[in-house]
Design a protein with these regions (language model features):
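Basic, glycine/lysine-rich polyanion-binding surfaces/domains
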Residues: 1-176
């Protein structure tokens, strides 16, 4: 996996405060990063995952689930697309199983899979407060598109419905 995770750089209390204010980022440690290229990638992934990915625009992100035949969650996938490549970010422990499953499901679709876990590391941060640093979102770009996954939970996503009152914490979380 790309890079080792350093526990703290100096004072964990100050670092935690900076993270909560949006002026710092944190290395999320080892993650599995799988890319899917090819003209059929969005239709193919749409057919395999729980999320409507067919009309995802370049730069948009989503959260998708890989379910077993009984509907139990096998993988939680943070999904990004840059217009030519779909980027799937998963926990490191699930990378190999997901890659194996996806490879078996290719059939005749025009897609190519690649394990990019060694090439990248994932950082996370909150976007809030006057100290927020939007330049952190430019850490990774592909095909001119920022590779920033935005957590959909603080709001209602397209096609979604709110079943309870709004979540009180308006802390937009991103991963780049």
């Amino acid at each position: 996996m790309a890079g080792e995770v350093k526990g703290s750089f100096a004072n964990p209390l100050i670092e935690q405060r900076q993270l909560a204010e949006g002026s710092a980022a944190v290395n999320l440690g080892p993650r599995g990063i799988i890319t899917v290229t090819g003209p059929d990638r969005l239709d193919w992934l749409h057919s395999l995952l729980s999320q409507n990915l067919k009309n995802l625009q370049p730069g948009q992100s989503a959260e998708a689930l890989l379910l077993d035949p009984n509907g139990h969650i096998e993988q939680v996938i943070h999904f990004l697309d840059d217009g030519e490549t779909s980027w799937l970010i998963v926990e490191a422990e699930g990378r190999e199983a997901l890659l194996k499953f996806l490879t078996k499901m290719v059939f005749r679709m025009k897609v190519e899979l690649s394990d990019r876990s060694e090439d990248f590391t994932v950082i996370g941060r909150l976007i809030r407060g006057e100290n927020a640093k939007p330049e952190l979102d430019q850490a990774a770009n592909s095909n001119g598109v920022s590779l920033t996954w935005v957590d959909p939970w603080p709001g209602v996503v397209t096609g979604g419905v709110r079943y309870s009152r709004a979540w009180p914490a308006k802390w937009p979380w991103t991963e780049t």
